[in-house]
Amino acid sequence: MSAPQQQQQSQQKQQQHVRVVEQQQVEPAEAVTSSMESESISASKELTGLTHECGVFGAIACGDWPTQMDIAHVICLGLVALQHRGQESAGIATSEGKCSKNFNVHKGMGMISTLFNDDSMKKLRGNLGIGHTRYSTAGGSGVVNCQPFEVHTTHGALALAHNGELVNNESLRREVLARGVGLSTHSDSELIAQSLCCAPEDVSELDGPNWPARIRHFMMLAPLSYSLVIMLKDKIYAVRDTYGNRPLCIGKIVPINAGHGNNLDTPADGWVVSSESCGFLSIGARYVREVEPGEIVELSRSGYRTVDIVERPDFKRMAFCIFEYVYFARGDSIFEGQMVYTVRLQCGRQLWREAPVEADIVSSVPESGTAAAHGYARESGIEFAEVLCRNRYVGRTFIQPSTRLRQLGVAKKFGALSENVAGKRLVLIDDSIVRGNTIGPIIKLLRDAGAREVHIRIASPPLQYPCYMGINIPTREELIANKLNPDQLARHVGADSLAYLSVEGLVEAVQLKHRDAGDSKSKGTGHCTACLTGEYPGGLPDELSW
């Protein structure tokens, strides 16, 4: 597809998203909340540039039910560890494993710490449950789109939480509506849930619903992008799309006195599934493995098992989002057998090889660029020192009341450590540049503190294309890399020089561990670089309007 065609279709896709938000209906009381959240979200996007859509979590107790384990608190702590994946809304749904008519559900707008108190947690009784943190990309902002999403079927209740974004949302929506099923929101999660409520024509269900077959049918219709947790009365299904675009992993809850070994032979107190493994230790769980691309995993009180694996179309390579390593994931999470922090460290090393510069100290924009800065410092032999002090009490969703205060927003978030800065030549590492709104004020802050030179190094390639697979990346016109080359951007933000890590360098850093180990598994790996290269995975249909 030519560049003009991509740009035209990108604009069409953006218009589709605008129509989705315009069509969203809310009650008057919710409208006030939605308006406030909209202002807050806009400010967040302007300050932070990129936002992930969601984090999902599920937990189930083993052994006799009712369990002595407080499942709701386990899920709540799991969601706290995933709060970086979504700060707009959150929710938890639990099941006691007996009555299939209703689940215990609590969800709403806001952060985990404000949504879940003692009263709400007491109502979330159960032996299993799922949870969700959300930042909207499709469906709009508002209470009506909070997850988990619950539907009632002739076979009982079903609750679902989703991370990602359906690339063929419109065709799936038409298919569901053609069956006479009403959709009350524009959320992908409701669409998935309603799709699962209808049995495929070629599946016999004389003995009750065949949920794995229904899930497989949905996966054949929807190539990407999703990681799902689906709760029924007494079990949870963990599902990852066939391209493995979004992360999902399994953990084992072990007894408190189990120690810190691999605990393979230790009886499980329960099982968890999560977008990331970063919260496992805090809930007494141990990382087991990832849910494989196309895999359907069933979790029950007896343990977990693979019930089906759906193959990728035409045996194409998997397409795990490479920006999970760059920006979105927490540094202590594990993807593809390696810690995210280690990959970011390697990105910094590679960045020095590609873009060296004479300097006195290496530093970072806290905190996402810190690991790469350490890698740059180690490879170059230049001392690492902190030059920015972060104000942790300025939230990501701080509403900026005027243009002047908005421009000074960085001053609210950061202070300069002048003793480390004055008279020094600095290399400042950041993970990415989106619109270029933030880095300029930071450079000015450092120069005001006495920096002699400020050289910017970005530990990822230029962002040039939107993402419609669960990441809020703006239109091509808003991305600064499409307006200015590195030299022009350096002058624009007031830096002495600016350079990015190459696409090849990023892929090298991500795949280095497997290649050095001669891991045959690496032959089957692959990463989505669509936001960097414009090469979208999966042979996407025309209706996507890329």
Curated annotation (Swiss-Prot):
Residue ranges annotated for the Glutamine amidotransferase type-2 domain, each copy included: 54-302
Q: Which reaction does it catalyse?
A: 5-phospho-beta-D-ribosylamine + L-glutamate + diphosphate = 5-phospho-alpha-D-ribose 1-diphosphate + L-glutamine + H2O
Propeptide residue interval(s): 1-53
Q: Which residues carry this modification: Phosphothreonine?
A: 114
Pathway(s) per entry: Purine metabolism; IMP biosynthesis via de novo pathway; N(1)-(5-phospho-D-ribosyl)glycinamide from 5-phospho-alpha-D-ribose 1-diphosphate: step 1/2
EC supergroup of this enzyme: transferase
Question: Its GO biological process terms?
Answer: 'de novo' IMP biosynthetic process; determination of adult lifespan; embryonic cleavage; oogenesis; purine nucleobase biosynthetic process; purine nucleotide biosynthetic process
Stretches for region Disordered: 1-39
Q: What happens when the gene is disrupted?
A: Reduction in viability and frequent wing defects.
Q: From start to end residue, where is composition biased (Low complexity)? A: 1-26
Task: Keyword check for Cell membrane, yes or no.
Answer: no
Q: Give the cofactor note.
A: Binds 1 Mg(2+) ion per subunit. Binds 1 [4Fe-4S] cluster per subunit.
Catalytic residues at 54
Q: Name the cofactor(s).
A: Mg(2+); [4Fe-4S] cluster
Entry's EC annotation: 2.4.2.14
GO molecular function terms here?
Answer: 4 iron, 4 sulfur cluster binding; amidophosphoribosyltransferase activity; metal ion binding
At which residues is Phosphoserine found? 113, 120
Q: State where Mg(2+) binds.
A: 368, 430-431
Sorted alphabetically, which keywords does the UniProt record give?
4Fe-4S, Glutamine amidotransferase, Glycosyltransferase, Iron, Iron-sulfur, Magnesium, Metal-binding, Phosphoprotein, Purine biosynthesis, Transferase
Residues annotated as binding [4Fe-4S] cluster: 321, 467, 528, 531
Q: Which Pfam families match?
A: GATase_6
Q: Which InterPro entries match?
A: GATase_2_dom, Ntn_hydrolases_N, PRibTrfase_dom, PRTase-like, PurF, PurF_N
Its function? Involved in the first step (and regulatory point) of the de novo biosynthesis of purine nucleotides, where it catalyzes the transfer of glutamine amide to 5-phospho-alpha-D-ribose 1-diphosphate.
User: Which family is it part of?
Assistant: In the C-terminal section; belongs to the purine/pyrimidine phosphoribosyltransferase family.
The protein here is known as Amidophosphoribosyltransferase
